[in-house]
Every structure is written in C-alpha cells, then in structure tokens.
Amino acid sequence: MSRVSGDWAEAYRRKWKWDRVAWSSHNVDCYPSGCPLHAYVKDGKILREEQAGSLPQIEPGIPDMNPMGCQKGASWPQLLDAPDRVTRPLRRVGERGEGKFEPVSWDVALTEIADAMLDAIEEQGPESIIVPMTPEMGASPARIFANALGAVITDGSAEFHDFSPGFHLTWGVFNPVASMDDWFLADLTLIWHANPVYTYITMYHYLAESRYNGGEIVTIAPDFSPSAVHADYHQPIRIGTDAALALAMCKVIIDAGLYQKQFVQEQTDLSLLVRTDTGRFLRGSDVAVGDRDDQFFWWDALTRSLTSAPRGTLATTGVEPALEGSYRVLLADDNAVEVEPVFARLRRELDDYTPEKAGAICEIHPDNIRALARKVATRKTKIFVGCNSGKSYHGDLMERAMALLLALTGNWGKKGTGVRSWAVIGLDGQAFLTQK
C-alpha cells in the first residue's frame, strides 16, 4: 500500500484535529427541526458537524428517532464564512431588479427604516406596515415586534401554501397529526402529494422501517419519484385528479359494505339528519322554539324516532343511528319536513364516481382503484400527504376526499392511522413562542 502524502493528505489530517466538541442544532423550516448535532470546533470556528444520534427510545418496540440530521445541516458551517454571505446592510441603488446595492452602516440602515415606518404610521396608521412571515423560524421576533406595533402580519402558510386547508376544514384543527414514529405502526401508507425520500430526510427511516415491520407503502404520484422507487407499489395518476380517485375508492368501499359502520355512526357527522328541502342539518331551533341552533339529531333505528345527538360526547350508547332511509319530522311551526342521514346523501353523490368513470378521469385502470380501496378498508391506513395538495386548484377538496376515505374505514384516532399533513413538530420552542 502506497503512502498518501502532499497538501491533500495534510488537509485531511487537519480535519481530524479539533479543540473541543460542542452541541449544535438548526432551527429552520424543516420538521421536526432541532436535530441534535456535534460541532467540532478549532480555533473558535466550526470545522464540521455530525449527527449526534443521542435521542432515547420513546416506546418499546418502536425505533428511536436517530440519527436526525441531513446534508443541508451538515453544509451549514460552510455558509458561515462563505464569500456571498450577507453580513451587513445593503441599500439598493438604481432600479428594482438591477441587482445593484451599496453597503451602509447599521446605524444608517436602522435609522432610514425606522423613519420610513414612523412616516407610514403618522400618515396612514400602523396597519399600513406589512410584515411578511417567512418559513424561517427566526421570524418569531419579527412577529412579536409587528404585534406590538399594530402592523399587519401575513399568513406564512398561505403565502407558500405549505398548509392543508381541507383537513383543517374537516377536523377543525390546524395540525391533525401524530408524531413521526407513528408511521412505523401503519399497515398501509399512502404517500400522496409527497416525496419524503427527498423532503423528509431525517424521518424517512420510519417509512422504510414500517416496510420491515410488515407494512405496505403505495406512492400515488404522476411521476416515478424517489419515493415511488422505494414503495411497494407506484400508482401513476393524472395531475389534479386526486379527488376523483379518493371518491371512487369511497364508492367501492360503501358499495361492497366494507365501511366501518360503528365508527361512521359515532365518530363522523354522516349519521346526522339533513333536511331535504334546504340541504342543511336539522337543528334544535327547527324542531322547537327557543332550542339550540347547534343541537343536531339522529334517527334511532331501534325506537324508530327522532333522537337528539348528545353534545358532550360522541358515544351512541343505547341508540342505533340510521345511515339510510328518509323520515318525516314535525317542525316547530307544525309543518312536516323530510329528513335523511348525511350518509344516504353521500351514497347518491358518489354515484358519479364509479371506478370506470374515475379511471377515465385519472388515467387509472378501474381494477387498480378497486384493489387500492380494499387495501385501505381492511388495514390500518395512514395517508402521508405533502404540501403539494395545498398548491393545487381545489386542493382542499382533494384533502377532504382523503379524509372521507379515512372516515369510512375508521382510520383515525388510533395508532398507525390518520394523516401526516403539514408539519410534525414538538409543540415547544420559538416556533410557537408567540402562539402560546
């Protein structure tokens, strides 16, 4: 073996000489963020960073979150001394778009900005100042400043559409997700509008480990993405037709009687009664003068009578909410109206979404739609949804169709089910400082 020598060898040796090892992390717009890293320091400068792999196992039988960290974080020390790093204020000279700037002192920059803000406040009020939010977590101090000033803060999620409005509308919560290790427990994972092999580097291992655990992964994507390469199945789809696919799967499940009846009755609004004349929920104020507007009703198949749905619990104890049929109800004005469960209306709405019709829309063979629907209906299913759906026209309806698919199959509220949408982060730290 020949001896390696020269400048290159000496540079390599210097890489393995350091003064101390410190803890480091990067709190930027990736999730869960806060990867524990070791920073190797020499002469007061960071030589490099490495994954610490120091996280404990949270639950027996489930892999830990190690190692955490990616090449983006590993390259961060190079940016500290990069020649194009902006280290002082720059003021534009010339026209917008020319890319011409001149350096100015901090005093000059802060004074000019403050003067402009004061002029705007005096002339038009503080609401004339707009502070755009960014994906950078360092925006938290800017948010605090803007709130104190009375300025307008934009919705960062709306600006770059990394948000799932359909799920928000369905469940009424901003972030309806479990922790990342829950992916490991899914029997079936649908990767939809996402490419986690590239975009979720630190936590993708849970999806790979899920396969080792006996789970199955299906990537639904128009392209043969890196995440499709590592899936059990890749289902190509025509861009923008995801809602049709999800609704066709729902129709297959209902027609085959594969839906989870008790879950649908108890955990969804599909069992509540709707007036056929208005298409609105039957409400307490419809039935009795002075009753609540937020009181809804079931039709009890056991007593064959109208029954108030309890407002303090989802339990259907002693009641068998009907999912089919139409019924006559006497209103407070002594007029009778026809009502039916939401489920009955849903069944009719899905008549237009046969596998054949949806297959023509989505460019998917009908048998593939049927097979995928049966997989979802018979397994603990998690949908790994990326932010691409929020960037699609009617993306909210795509997400609501996905939520309906999970509702019919009882796939939320227990381990290994539900959706992974938007961010999965620890509810602590500067990202949530101004939201507490």
Please give the residue ranges for each predicted region.
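Secondary-structure capping and boundary motifs in well-ordered enzyme cores
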Residues: 216, 223, 241, 350, ...
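N-terminal export/assembly segments and adjacent metallocofactor-ligating motifs
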Residues: 1-262, 266-325, 338, 356-357, ...
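A charged, amphipathic alpha-helical module
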Residues: 341, 345-371, 375-378
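Conserved alpha/beta enzyme-core scaffolds, especially Rossmann-like or related mixed alpha/beta domains
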Residues: 125-128, 232, 332-340, 349-352, ...
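Short acidic (Asp/Glu) and glycine-rich catalytic loops that position anionic groups and cofactors
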Residues: 225-230, 323, 348-354, 379-385
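A glycine-rich, hydrophobic/aromatic-adjacent loop/helix-cap motif
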Residues: 356, 367, 376-436
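Non-catalytic, well-ordered alpha-helical scaffold segments
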Residues: 139, 143, 243-247, 344, ...
